[in-house]
Amino acid sequence: MSGHDAIAASVGEEPRALWRHLDLGRCDPVRAQAFVESVAESVAAGEVPNTLVTAQPNAPYVSLGFHQSFSEEIDEGFLARRRVPVLRRVEGGGTTWLDPDQWFYQLAYREEDGGPGGPADLVRFLRAPVAAARLLGLSAELRAPSDLVVGDRKVSGNAGGDWAGAHILVGGVLGRADHRAMSDLLKLPHPAIRPIVREEIERRVTSWEAETGSLPAYAAWRDHLVEAFRAQGLFRSRPGRPTPSEETRFRTETTARHEDPSWRELPPAAKAPGPVVRRLRIAGPHGLLVLSATGTDRLGVAVVHGATVREAYAVGPPAGREGARRLAEGTDEFAEIARAVANDPGFA
Amino acid sequence: MSSAPPRVPPGAGVCAIGPDLWYRPEADGTVVVGLTDAAQRRAGALAHYRGPLPGRSFRAGEPALSLESEKWVGHLGLPVDGTVVATNPAAETDPGTINRDPYGAGWLYRMRPRVPADLEARRGPVL
């Protein structure tokens, strides 16, 4: 009995649903990220079955969550140095660095025969990427609703959205993690905050290679994933090709949308009054809050787990690494930051 | 998921429209639209709300606004053809308002239907 068969036996009956599998392989970032948007329209129209897409971007890029602000999120100096595109996805979540060392899976499905959409679908469908990873030697688990983790460290981020009458779930596995790019791309209000961000990213984000010492071939991972969706009782799939209308829509509508500066630079969301000037979610409940200190030119930085402050720093005014001073727990400054964090909606 | 009951029950004249929305007619011919309590519970704690642009006209169902919870984005349309008159700034600034008070302070937007009778045709039960 293969590993997948053992899983299938434990899960129960063979799934009846038959989906299409589109393997885009290595392709440019717009296609790797957004072809699924074109697919979703075909799925919603009933022209094609619910569809699993797999892909690997052939170049690095930055992906903004649908509600993220380009002007507030991205360091323009980083973009000028690295010359990478920034694409806004239609799904949720935060700003992410994506590159050829990451493998993507995307689902486009109808409500009536795929699932109701929403966070519960993330939990249900992510059983398959977890199972595929485990069969290939990576001891991943789901940290509900949307992260795959090894221990407490994130190895895969996932998100979803409703688009054009269908639901889309997107995710990726970190084969290798470029922690420096992940931290350098973020716009920060003071340079002394960047080392704190990088250290927290290194602490909270891992990769397949870091955990196992090697990387499976993309094709092996893809095949295990396809089989895991079946073995987990979710759906069977049959290899397919994009339809002419999907290709046309992708060229004429999807690509045009992603190349339109007004799509990339959607206006930032209104902000609630309060001391938090920057909120950075790193992985699950882990993140950083940057706070202004009333009446001073200093900033406070809280490294948080949910609403609990694990570390706190006073930052500024000198530029450079010297600008950050770690605060001892029990001091008035630490307590002031902890109070502000407790009153913040955090990463709700 | 938000399990607390809404703090403010629906007021007089609030009707369901579609599976997720309610509306309340105003004296000037506009209607206020919001998310039903059941819909906000299904969505869970809302992290983002981007309202429709005031002054812009939309066809029914055309994506006009978005809500996000737990990394899932819902792109919603207006229930009928019409023009957006106002978006609720309090809900944009603090989307948790929609969870806490879906029939009151957490309203989403105010719109003027192109054909008022369309609302009546799609009207669900009084809430």
Q: Language-model segments: which ranges?
A:
Chain A
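Short coil/turn connectors at secondary-structure junctions
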Residues: E47-T51, N58-P60, R81-V84, P100-D101, ...
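Short, surface-exposed beta-strand-loop junctions and turns on beta-sheet-rich folds
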Residues: F70-S71, E111, P318-A319
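Intrinsically disordered, low-complexity regulatory segments enriched in Ser/Thr/Pro
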Residues: L188, I196, D297-R326
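A short glycine/serine-rich beta->alpha loop
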Residues: R89-T95, D113-P116, R325-R326
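Catalytic beta-strand/loop module used to bind and position nucleotide/cofactor moieties
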Residues: T96, P100-W221, L225-A228, E253, ...
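A generic local secondary-structure boundary/capping motif
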Residues: E41-V43, L52, D75-E76, G94-T96, ...
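Glycine/serine-rich anion-binding loops at beta->alpha junctions
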Residues: R83-W103
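Active-site loop/lid in soluble adenylation, ligation, and acyl-transfer enzymes
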Residues: S2-E73, G77, R89, P189, ...
